[in-house]
């Protein structure tokens, strides 16, 4: 009985990880920084700035912590 429960748990875990990986955001192709989205969908605090940059022909999201004067 315990072996069956462990097997079912492993199958559920495997399928949940598979479904999560299917929903992951794919990398966006680009040539320059202008080809990347201007604003990310993620909301941040005023002290953190998020922006995309084109690196190796893919848009990559960067986080920048702003300094207070």
UniProtKB/Swiss-Prot annotation:
Keywords: Metal-binding, Nodulation, Signal. GO terms for biological process: nodulation. GO terms for molecular function: metal ion binding. It comes from the Eukaryota. It holds the Pfam family Nodulin_late. InterPro entries: Nodulin_late_dom. Residues 1-24 form the signal peptide. Disulfide bonds: none annotated. Contains 4 cysteines arranged in two pairs in such a way that they might be capable of binding a metal ion. This is Nodulin-3. It comes from Pisum sativum.
């Amino acid at each position: 009985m315990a072996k069956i429960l462990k097997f079912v748990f492993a199958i559920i875990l495997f399928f949940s990880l598979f479904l999560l990986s299917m929903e992951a955001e794919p990398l966006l192709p680009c040539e320059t920084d202008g080809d990347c989205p201007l604003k990310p969908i993620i909301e941040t605090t005023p002290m953190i700035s998020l922006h995309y940059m084109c690196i190796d022909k893919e848009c990559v999201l960067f986080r920048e912590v702003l300094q207070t004067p």
